[in-house]
């Protein structure tokens, strides 16, 4: 009887404390005609909660997204949507490239503490051991390339939208690795977590800055499992050690879209060195004059290097407050010392030695989260900057406070998001001096294209959502009579592009 009661009690506890699961959007298909695109999908929820379903349309412009109001959307959209087979029809907007987001969520919330606690110090340590080594464009080019590859591979494997921003630094082409986890309803509002991945030529760079890279990688793994209203962007910056070259190029040479609103940057700059010994923390000259309260508090604690420094300017108060709140809420054992520099930090050059400064110069809110570099870690920029000198508990807590801030500020959704890219193009029937016939329409098992005076051409056929179905080049002899087998193509509306030296003919062809 005792064992039976314990079993019943255990089941009750599991049921009582089990997390409500978010709804899921599954089995999505789309059908398109000349006027609308219809999305068919299955809405599932383990608890059969009714959901709110939204559809957002954005016009793609370069690397940015512009919200678009589309009237006449019909179907299973709005509040109190039950589970089951659903459909939403969207009137086609004007010519252009678009992002369509379908969002479904219930009335529940995630346990954010549980997400924060997913940060794994053993994982951080493993990443640090691998990252440790000379990551420098001349003194350690092979190791630098290996780290670049692992960052790119991680971002791709997590199904983010990765990109590489490049710029020249002398004869060297620097590479900033970027991964975007786009927001469901406000993708142009962006939170950034960054770290530079290079190091000085004469050190293994464990604290500076493998800790930052490992922390960013850990957050990117965890964040990938969730959806947000706003976008979260991860950036691995190159050539920081030569004067913030990578981040300056990113901010000033096309890395940021003019349509983007950067709501906060969490820049990791050495986050792993900790000491609870008296006099392990020194301060820059004049620190006590600019920051008297913080200086007095550090002195009262016997100058122990047992805190993370949260460096902000006045424009960065919002993201700074979010980090402090997260530390207090989710990691109360992490001691945070916040410094607000005047203006953009011209009076405090020691607080401008990392990539946050590039964002400050551009008027973007950014923090430098740091253990204090050479004012605490005497292994800074030496061959002794190794993993085994670092404190995983401290580093893990910094990462936890950071991910907590991102969860809150990016507005996590207890739900699912389906994204689809849509291309809308108006047909062009003819070109001067060229005769082209594309038939039959609707097509059957063979699509015929005949032409006169076309010369060399390329035939490109894609769905209206942009998926490439067929692409082939033809010389002038073959272009007059082309036959394309279409028996295996699904029913849809297709865009046929017949491209010649004189121009491009576009025709919409339907398969029923």
Predicted features by range, described:
Residues 1-22, 426-428:
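Bacterial Sec-dependent N-terminal signal peptides
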Residues 42-49, 59, 453:
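Extracellular acidic, Ser/Thr/Pro-rich low-complexity tracts
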Residues 82-84, 88, 96, 455, ...:
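A glycine-anchored, Pro-Gly-centered beta-turn/N-cap motif
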Residues 108-143, 198, 376-385:
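N-terminal capping segment at the start of a domain
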Residues 126-182, 336:
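A non-catalytic alpha/beta surface segment that caps or lines the substrate-entry region
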Residues 200-315:
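Acidic/histidine-rich catalytic neighborhood of metal-dependent amide-processing enzymes
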Residues 271, 277-422:
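Active-site-adjacent substrate-binding region
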Residues 429-512:
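C-terminal outer-membrane/trafficking sorting elements
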């Amino acid at each position: 009887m005792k064992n039976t009661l314990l079993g019943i009690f255990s089941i009750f506890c599991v049921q009582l404390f089990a997390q409500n699961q978010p709804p899921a959007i599954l089995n999505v298909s789309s059908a398109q005609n000349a006027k609308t695109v219809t999305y068919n999908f299955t809405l599932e929820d383990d608890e059969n909660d009714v959901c709110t379903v939204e559809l957002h349309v954005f016009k793609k412009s370069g690397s940015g997204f512009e919200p678009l109001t589309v009237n006449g959307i019909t179907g299973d959209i709005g509040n109190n949507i039950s589970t089951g087979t659903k459909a939403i029809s969207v009137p086609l907007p004007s010519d252009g490239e678009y992002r369509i987001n379908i969002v479904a969520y219930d009335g529940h919330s995630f346990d954010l503490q549980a997400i924060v606690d997913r940060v794994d110090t053993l994982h951080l340590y493993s990443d640090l051991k691998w990252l440790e080594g000379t990551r420098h464009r001349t003194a350690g080019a092979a190791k630098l390339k290996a780290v670049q590859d692992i960052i790119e591979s991680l971002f791709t494997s997590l199904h983010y939208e990765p990109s590489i921003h490049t710029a020249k630094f002398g004869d060297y082409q620097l590479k900033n690795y970027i991964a975007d986890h786009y927001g469901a309803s406000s993708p142009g509002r962006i939170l950034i977590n960054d770290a530079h991945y290079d190091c000085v030529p004469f050190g293994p760079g464990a604290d500076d800055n493998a800790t930052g890279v490992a922390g960013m990688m850990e957050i990117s793994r965890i964040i990938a499992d969730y959806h947000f209203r706003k976008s979260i962007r991860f950036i691995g910056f190159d050539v920081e050690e030569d004067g913030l070259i990578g981040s300056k190029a990113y901010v000033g040479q096309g890395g940021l879209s003019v349509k983007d609103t950067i709501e906060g940057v969490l820049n990791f700059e050495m986050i792993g060195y900790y000491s609870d010994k008296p006099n392990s923390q020194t301060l820059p000259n004049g620190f006590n004059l600019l920051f008297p309260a913080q200086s007095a508090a550090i002195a009262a604690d016997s100058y122990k290097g047992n805190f993370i420094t949260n460096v902000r300017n006045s424009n960065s108060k919002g993201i700074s407050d979010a980090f402090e709140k997260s530390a207090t809420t989710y990691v109360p054992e992490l001691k945070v010392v916040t410094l607000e520099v005047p203006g953009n930090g011209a009076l405090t050059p020691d607080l401008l030695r990392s990539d946050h400064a590039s964002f400050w110069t551009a008027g973007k809110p950014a923090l430098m989260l740091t253990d204090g570099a050479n004012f605490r870690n005497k292994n800074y920029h030496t061959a002794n900057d190794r993993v085994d000198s670092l404190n995983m508990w401290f580093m893990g807590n910094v990462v936890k406070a950071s991910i907590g801030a991102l969860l809150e500020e990016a507005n996590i959704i207890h739900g699912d998001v389906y994204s689809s890219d849509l291309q809308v193009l108006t047909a062009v029937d003819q070109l001067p001096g060229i005769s082209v016939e594309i038939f039959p329409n609707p097509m059957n098992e063979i699509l015929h294209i005949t032409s006169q005076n076309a010369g060399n051409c390329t035939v490109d056929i894609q769905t209206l959502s942009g998926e490439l179905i067929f692409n082939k080049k033809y010389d002038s002899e073959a272009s007059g009579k082309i036959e394309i087998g279409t028996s295996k193509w699904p029913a849809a509306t297709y865009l046929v592009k017949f491209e010649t030296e004189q121009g491009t003919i576009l025709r919409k062809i339907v398969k029923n």
